[in-house]
């Protein structure tokens, strides 16, 4: 059985995602698609607009065979951590033949060339990067300039200016790191750019769709303008659950975040993942002006500190994700803060194995995939939390973090929409 893996957020599941699944199956000739999906929090450092089980159901109705949850440590991490965590899980399943991702470039050879340079970090390139960083340039800009000079090909370095290209390169780096046999495929992105805020006729970005849902001209019109941008099943799911479990936004968590910030000092803040000394000092200095999560990110951002990086750091503070959380626990063993650091001062893993794969839902007709995973995987497959026993200490810590994050998300839903609280142990698998 040939299986293609897809790493996604589906925030929400739209026509572009449907196209990606269809193309992934067609281009690879795979029999089924397994999706590793972010849970209730996503990589830009924010809650997903809809709960993970709802988004998982939409993806299953859209043609995915099995949905696994990407642990929150990875789902709200830097592009490098996001990609390496996801690839680690797919690699540990032992039955994934292909990894298919969207890319503005779509040229796997060019992406692989950049991945090789960024993985090996030749001394000349490393020195060029350090020179750019010393000039005070933000890391993405410094890296692109260094690559342009190193490769003598500005068009090649320009590939890094697009977010899906950047993430695709991180997937390729991770495949190299784990010496994975999984074969990568890049699907050229169609329609709007990742960060485009306007709807288009073909494939609009998730950003544009979220903005329209969150800012309707009238409450009853929240989905009328985006109905054509979503597969019918996804549109129906979102519409039926509107104002009962969605939409959820950053600012719904503002009071919780403010409380956490009031409990911290400048020195304690630097214990959290992605919080530098500079950011910690800015948080403390501006804390009295905190109004909402989003406005606080705007207040804190600088040329070097982007909105997304700040938001991601604030999410780590809210969820209690510290740099030392897994420092002594294989397969993580974090060393220093990374993401914007070159050379050896990076998060590294002491093993090529992930910790677990947790099922959110599957199609009944594709239960053979679960059997293959159970046969070939080197990590536990968790279908019921109550059955997740005999886990290593690191696995239990990571799983507890997922449970806490989802219970926190559910608490916001309960408070915002007046619905009964359903804890993570009570939630049912999505089976269609």
Regions found by a protein language model. Name each.
Residues 69-432:
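Active-site cores that bind ATP or allylic diphosphates and position pyrophosphate for catalysis
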Residues 8, 42-43, 59, 73-74, ...:
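Short, contiguous strand/loop micro-motifs
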Residues 28-30, 64, 95-96:
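Short, high-confidence coil segments that cap the C-terminus of an alpha-helix
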Residues 56-71:
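A glycine-rich helix N-cap at a beta->alpha junction
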Residues 49-53, 61, 76-84:
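Generic alpha-helical scaffold signal
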Residues 25, 56-60, 173, 210:
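Class I S-adenosyl-L-methionine
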Residues 1-55:
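N-terminal catalytic cores of NTP/NDP-binding nucleotidyl/phosphoryl-transfer enzymes
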Residues 25-26, 60, 87, 91-92:
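Non-catalytic positions within long, well-ordered alpha-helices that form the structural scaffold/packing
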């Amino acid at each position: 059985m040939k299986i293609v893996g897809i790493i996604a957020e589906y925030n929400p599941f739209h026509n572009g995602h449907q196209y990606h699944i269809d193309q992934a199956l067609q281009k690879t000739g795979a029999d089924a698609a397994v999706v590793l999906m972010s849970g209730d929090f996503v990589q830009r450092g924010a809650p997903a607009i809809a709960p993970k089980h709802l988004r998982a159901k939409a993806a299953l109705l859209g043609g995915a065979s099995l949905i696994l949850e990407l642990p929150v440590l990875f789902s709200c991490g830097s592009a490098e951590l996001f990609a390496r965590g996801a690839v680690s899980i797919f690699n540990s399943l032992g039955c994934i033949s292909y990894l298919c991702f969207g890319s503005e470039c779509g040229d796997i050879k060019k992406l692989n060339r950049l991945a090789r340079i960024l993985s090996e970090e030749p001394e000349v390139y490393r020195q060029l990067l350090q020179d750019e960083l010393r000039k005070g340039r933000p890391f993405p800009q410094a890296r692109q300039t260094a690559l342009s000079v190193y490769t003598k090909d500005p068009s090649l370095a320009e590939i890094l200016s697009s977010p899906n290209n950047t993430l695709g390169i991180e997937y390729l780096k991770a495949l190299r790191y784990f010496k994975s046999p999984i074969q990568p495929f890049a699907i050229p992105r169609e329609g709007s750019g990742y960060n485009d805020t306007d709807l288009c006729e073909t494939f609009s970005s998730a950003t544009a769709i979220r903005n329209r849902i969150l800012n309707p001209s009238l409450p009853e019109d929240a989905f009328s303008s985006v109905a054509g941008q979503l597969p019918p099943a996804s549109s129906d799911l979102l519409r039926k659950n509107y104002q009962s479990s969605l939409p959820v936004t950053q600012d719904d968590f503002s009071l919780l975040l403010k409380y956490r910030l009031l409990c911290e000092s400048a020195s304690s803040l630097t214990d959290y993942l992605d919080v530098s000394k500079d950011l910690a000092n800015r948080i403390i200095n501006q804390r009295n002006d905190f109004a909402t999560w989003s406005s606080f990110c705007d207040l804190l951002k600088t040329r070097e500190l982007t909105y997304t990086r700040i938001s991601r750091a604030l999410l780590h503070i809210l969820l209690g994700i510290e740099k030392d959380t897994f420092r002594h626990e294989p397969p993580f063993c974090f060393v220093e803060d990374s993401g914007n650091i070159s050379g050896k001062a990076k998060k590294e893993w002491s093993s090529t194995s992930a910790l677990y794969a947790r099922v959110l839902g599957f199609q009944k007709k594709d239960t053979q995939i679960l059997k293959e995973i159970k046969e070939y995987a080197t990590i536990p497959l968790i279908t019921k939390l109550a059955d997740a026993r005999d886990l290593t200490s690191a696995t239990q810590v990571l799983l507890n973090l997922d449970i806490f994050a989802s219970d926190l998300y559910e608490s916001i839903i309960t408070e915002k929409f007046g619905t009964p609280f359903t804890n993570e142990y009570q939630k049912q698998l999505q089976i269609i």
